[in-house]
């Protein structure tokens, strides 16, 4: 009887095992609904192993104390824990103007650079003229611990203390008929290769002319002046500074017996309609260094054309209009720290459109990028003094060649245009790695103001 009873019990057990398995073991997705995974107990040997963040907190859910045991450093633990709990709040880079982000639980903290504040460092504190020019439209200077704005001549400071309001219809630096941004922007010139390449020659030639520039619109460069010799020919350019003052290059002055000036023209082919303005006096900088010998001569002066600046005083005032407006004269600090740190400037003139061809009858205009001083000096066989700077392109197959010396290099800041350079000299035409060289106007602001104040 006993063997039969034992057999029955064994058969009953074997029959019940599949049923038990189907009732106890569930799929993981279903089990997770009501089963919460708990930390497994460490084995005897695991307790004495060094802490491992992957084992403690990635493979399993850990506590902050367990994370601290791994890092053994409170700051590192806090950094890890803030991300571990709810993700990295700094992943979207919420701090503006290069502020530093520190993650928190459900929040973040921005540490701002000097002159910035706000939750995201979004507010600029204009306590320095180096930060966005102190929010000034024109000139900025530091007074005690604050910035103070001022404006160019013929403008007044706005009630907000930052803006500059024109006091007349023909305030300096305003070109009412400016080229639209698409045409005038530097990237378009570069990509379409419409811009002229300003380069230098085998010998430093003062006769730099704009080659392959775009035709200027009437009123686009209203500060442009043209110097005419006794034969009625264009020989140099200039920049209108006031009703009786025109800025030009010193080396232009000894090229002719007499000088007349034309303003407000973009086409000088019709000599019978153009109006010649008479000159009263010409002031050449006393330190100007003319070339005394031809290039290649053993005594050739490699600092020729230093102090290449002159001012023409008119007999009768220039009449301003939409097409005749002076360029604004900057302060030295504004020119050096703001204007010449822009991407590019604007050059215009009636120069030759091709090497050794006649001068252009129509005004040409180009945009040229500033070139850093180190690159400028390395590119030249001649000395680039502190009174000079370079601008132009080093690879595009356009060039400036033979001509419009004395003409304006203008830099826009907002809607106002300031004189920053005078076309001075160059080394050849279309030579790779060469640039146009300009007289640096910021070096001569006191001299210019002194000459303009003379009666």
Swiss-Prot record:
Glycosylation sites: 92, 254
Record keyword Translocase present: no
Domain EGF-like: start-end pairs: 86-121, 129-164
GO annotation (BP), single: venom-mediated blood coagulation
Site (Not modified): 103
Domain Gla: 41-86
Residues annotated as signal peptide: 1-20
Function, as annotated: Snake prothrombin activator that attacks the hemostatic system of prey. This protein is functionally similar to blood coagulation factor Xa. The procoagulant activity of hopsarin-D is approximately 10-fold lower than that of trocarin-D and FXa.
Note, other: Is classified in the group D of snake venom prothrombin activators, since it requires the mammalian factor Va for maximal activity for the cleavage of prothrombin. In contrast to blood coagulation factors that circulate as inactive zymogen in plasma, venom prothrombin activators are always found in the active form in the venom.
Protein name in the entry: Venom prothrombin activator hopsarin-D
Species of provenance: Hoplocephalus stephensii (Stephens's banded snake)
